[in-house]
Every structure is written in C-alpha cells, then in structure tokens.
Swiss-Prot record:
Biological process, per Gene Ontology: G protein-coupled dopamine receptor signaling pathway; negative regulation of transcription by RNA polymerase II; regulation of transcription by RNA polymerase II
Similarity comment text for this entry: Belongs to the Sp1 C2H2-type zinc-finger protein family.
Zinc finger (C2H2-type): 126-150, 156-180, 186-208
UniProt-recorded name of the protein: Krueppel-like factor 16
GO cellular component assignments: nucleus
Keywords of this entry: DNA-binding, Metal-binding, Nucleus, Phosphoprotein, Repeat, Transcription, Transcription regulation, Zinc, Zinc-finger
InterPro entries per UniProt: Znf_C2H2_sf (IPR036236), Znf_C2H2_type (IPR013087)
Bias (Pro residues) ranges: 53-65, 239-251
PROSITE patterns: ZINC_FINGER_C2H2_1, ZINC_FINGER_C2H2_2
PANTHER family registered for this protein in UniProt: KRUEPPEL-LIKE FACTOR 16, KRUEPPEL-LIKE TRANSCRIPTION FACTOR
Protein species of origin: Mus musculus (Mouse)
CDD domains membership: KLF16_N
Length: 251
C-alpha cells in the first residue's frame, strides 16, 4: 500500500514538473496516404532537462484555452485538479472576478456553507440518553432543560409568599412571577391595553381591523384612530368620557 502511494506521489511530482517547465504537444508529419489521422501524431512532453523557454530555438509554451470568464487557467490550478483526480479529493473550481483574477473555490466548502449562521460542521452532538427518545441539541444547556421533562425535576421555585409553585425552566418562572406583580410588559400598538404574555398580545392585536404583523415588531408605534380601538371598547376597555362643550358667552 505504501509503495502504491509513493508511486502516485512520484507520478504527481513528475506531472507538476512537466507543467512548470511547459509541456509541448507536437504534431508529426502527415502519415502515408490512406493512413488514419492517428498515424501522424507524435505526442512528446518536455522533461526536466529541457531547454529553458527563453533560449533561442526553444519551443514556445503551449497556449491555454480561455475559461468562461475570459481568463487563462493558471498552471498551479491545473496541477491541483490533476492531484485531486489522483487522490480522489474534491475538485477545485475557479470563480472569475470582475478584475480579471481568479480565486480557488472548493466545491465541498461551498456546499457546506451554512445558511443559519452556525459554524461549518456544527452538529447536534448532545443527545438524550433516555431510551426511546431520539432528540438531540446543539448546546448542553438545551439538553439539560429537556432532561427535566423525563425526570420531572423543577428546580425553579416561586419565592412569592404563599406560593409553592415550581417550574422546570427559568423563563416559565419569570412569566409566572408577573402574575403576582401585575407587570404587563407587552403593550398593544393599536390601543391602550397591556398584557403579561406576548402570545396574549398577539391574540388580542389580531382583532383590530387595522392590524398588521409588523406592528408587533415595532414597540413604540401607536395609532389613535377610533376605528382601530373599537374592538377593545367592545371587550370592556374604558372609553373616554365626552368633553362638555363650553356654554355660550353672555348666559
């Protein structure tokens, strides 16, 4: 096995040296009449000891065909593709830029570029050890929270006087704590109502005739249109009392 690998490496090195010195393909004289076209071909490649290209009488280097972007392929890119074919690795493609240069782009790296923002090669390595559960997570903290659904552990206890409730997650405890304090962190952008939970706000805001989903993503936007606040008044929200008109002067 090692001898085969050494043979492949030697052949690859020989190919690289032939490319760097400028391989030349000569076409021999036409063969005798009636012979096929292959009879007159004489393919020769310059060796390591070939005459340098700058000396008189040296054959000109072969012209490379222009690629799709108009730029000629560099010898090291051709050598890289030959080595990739020999070793069975990914083929390196070239993307032509507007300035006329080329930059190597690996097809495997382009295929593995994540669209979700995670680092390449990230995987859900934290798997649930419980039998019959195939869930996996990117972070160990997420797995730890999931394990509590199996064990029934609730480490987050409410410290409000007279309340003995416990929760498996800290965000559940924080949401429950607002039921004691009366804090309503989610205001409706179309009326004066506020809510302790965001899902309650979404359910309420959809009842407005002028509701748009983007309004919930802009917390300072408010509308004073009476038609927008009509569903809130129907639901029991306080309506402003009419302002009495001033009495005529002289009475």
């Amino acid at each position: 096995m090692s001898a085969a690998v050494a043979c492949v490496d030697y052949f690859a090195a020989d190919v690289l040296m032939a490319i760097s010195s400028g391989a030349v393909v000569h076409r021999g004289r036409p063969g005798p009449e009636g012979a096929g076209p292959a009879a007159g071909l004489d393919v020769r490649a310059t060796r390591r000891e070939a005459t340098p290209p700058g000396t008189p009488g040296a054959p000109p280097p072969p012209a490379t065909a222009p690629g799709p972007g108009g730029a000629t392929a560099a010898p090291h890119l051709l050598a890289a593709s030959i080595l990739a074919d020999l070793r069975g690795g990914p083929v390196v493609a070239t993307a032509a830029s507007t300035a006329g240069g080329t930059s190597p782009v690996s097809s495997s790296s382009a295929a593995s570029s994540p669209s979700s923002g995670r680092a390449p090669g990230a995987a859900k390595s934290h798997r649930c050890p419980f039998h019959g559960c195939a869930k996996a997570y990117y972070k160990s903290s997420h797995l730890k929270s999931h394990l509590r659904t199996h064990t029934g552990e609730r480490p987050f206890a409410c410290d409000w006087p007279g309340c003995d409730k416990k929760f498996a997650r800290s965000d559940e405890l924080a949401r429950h704590h607002r039921t004691h304090t009366g804090e309503k962190r989610f205001p409706c952008p179309l009326c004066t109502k506020r809510f302790t939970r965001s899902d309650h706000l979404t359910k309420h805001a959809r009842r407005h005739p002028g509701f748009r989903p983007e309004l919930l993503r802009r917390p300072g936007a408010r509308s004073v249109s009476p038609s927008d606040s009509l569903p809130c008044s129907l639901a029991g929200s306080p309506t402003p009392s009419p302002v009495p008109s001033p009495a005529p002067a002289g009475l």
